[in-house]
Amino acid sequence: PRGSFKEEKIADFVCSFAENLGLEYTRDSANNVVVRKPATPGYEAHEVVMLQGHMDMIWNKRPDSTFDFEHEGIKLKVTDDGYLMAEETTCGSDDGVAVAYMLAILQDKSLKHPELECVFTTAEEPGLYGVQKFDCSQLKARKYVSMDGNLEGTSLLIAAGAANARFTKRFQREVLKDAAELAIQVHGLTGAHVQFQERQLANAIKTVVRIVYYIRKEVPCRLISLNGGSQTTIPVDCTARIALALEHMDKAREVAQRVLEEVKFEHKESDPNMTLSLSEKAHASPAMPEDVTDKVVTLLRLLPAGLVDTSLVFPGLPISSFSLETIETTDSSIGWFYRPTSAITSKMLDMDEQSRLLAQLFDVEYHVENYFYGHNVEAGTPLYNVFDQVWFEQNGEHIRPIGAHYGNEIGFFLRNMPWLDMILLVATHYQAHTPDEKLDIASFDRCYRCLVEILRRV
C-alpha cells in the first residue's frame, strides 16, 4: 500500500519498471517520477503528450479490521457485479487507475503515439505536497492528459484551489484543585469528502465546540483537550474534555444534551444518526488556562466552516468553502487543520487573509503549509475535440464538461505550463477514500481503449 509520504517503494518499482524497458526516467527528492517513451515511427514531429496521475492512496479500513497498511498488501477481490474492491480497506483506485494506465502504455510496444512524458506524482491526497516540489522545466509536453477523477465520459473544466493552513495555540497546563472531568463526544455524523460542501453536512468539531461554548455560558469550565476529524473529510467524530466543579456536572450534561438536540434538528435530513456520548471522571487532568480556553473556543465558534457560494454555470457546484477538518491537542498545544477553498484564486487568497486576521485577533498562530491552485478551462480545444470524437465513436455519447469542488494537480501544471492543452480522462469508481471504494472494471477497459486511441490520433 502506497500511503501519502510513503511512496518510496512504489517509486522504486516505477523506476525499475522503466529501467527494465530501457526507458529514460528521472526521480526527485519527493519521489515524483517522470518516465519518457519515445515517439513511434511517423509521430516524431507530433507535440509531446504528458500523462499524469498520483501514486499515493488514502489508507482507510473498517473499524473492526486488523489490517496493517505498513506491512500487508491490499487484498483485492472482484465482485459479481463487475467491480474491483479490497477486503476491509480502500482499494487504491484513486489514483491507481492512472498508474496502471501509464505502466501499460509504457510497456506496450504495439501502440502508436507521440513522445510521451508519464508523470507519477506523490502526496497528492493530503494537499498536493509532492507536486509542489516538481520541476516543470524538465517537461516538453504541449498536451496534457490528467487521470485523477472518478466519472467516465466527463472532463473537468473547473476545479478549486486552496490554502492548506494550520492554527496553533501553545500553552502551559494548570492543575485545578477539586475539579472533575467531563468528556463530550459527538459521533455518528454522515461525513463526506470535503468537496461535497453543497450537502451542508454537520461538522463534528463545530458541533462539539458549540456545546462547550454554551456550557461555558452556564458554568465555569476549562478545556483539557479537543480531538477529532480526518483530513479531506467533513468531520464525523470529535471529543472535548473539560474540567469543571463536580457540582456543575449535571448542568453541563443538560446543556450538552440540549445543544446536541438543536444541532441534530438543524441537520435532521443530512445527519440523522448524530449521537452524543458523555462520560465523567472524578479527577480532571491538567487543563488549559482560562484565557487560552476562551480564545480557542471563541475563535473556533467564529471560524466559518462549510459552503460559501455556488456556481452560476454549474448549478449546485460549490465555488468557495471553508473546511475545518481535524483538531488535535498535545500536552502543550492545540492545533487544527483548516482549508479556505475556492475555484477563483483571488477569492481563495482573500479567504486565507480573513482566516489570518481572525487568528491575529485571538493571538493564535496561523501558518499556511502550502497553496494549490484551481483551474478554469474551456471545452472545444483541439485535444478536447479529439477526446469527444473518440468517446462518441466508441460509446455513443459526447463528453460532458463538469466542475468539481476539489483540488488536484491539474491547477499546478496549468499554472506552471499555461500553454498546455488539457483533458481529464478517468474510469468510474465510487466511494473513494472509504473501505467501500470500488472500481468499475468495464469502465476501466472503456477508458483505456479511449486513451490509446486518443494518443494514436494526436
Language model regions located:
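A non-catalytic alpha/beta surface segment that caps or lines the substrate-entry region
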Residues: 3-47, 402
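Active-site metal-coordination/substrate-binding segment of hydrolases
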Residues: 43-120, 124-126, 131-144, 151-152, ...
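Short, conserved charged micro-motifs
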Residues: 44-45, 246-255, 345-350
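Midchain, well-structured core segments that form catalytic/ion-binding scaffolds
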Residues: 74, 81-84, 125-126, 131-340
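Glycine/charged-rich beta-loop-alpha catalytic/anionic-binding loops adjacent to active sites
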Residues: 75-89, 189-190, 392-397, 429-432
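Active-site-adjacent substrate-binding region
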Residues: 195-228, 365, 369-371, 375-420
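His/Asp/Glu-rich mid-to-C-terminal helical/loop segments that flank catalytic regions of hydrolases
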Residues: 199-218, 249, 292-301, 308-312, ...
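Zn-dependent metallopeptidase/amidohydrolase metal-coordination segment
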Residues: 312-315, 319-339, 390-391, 395-453
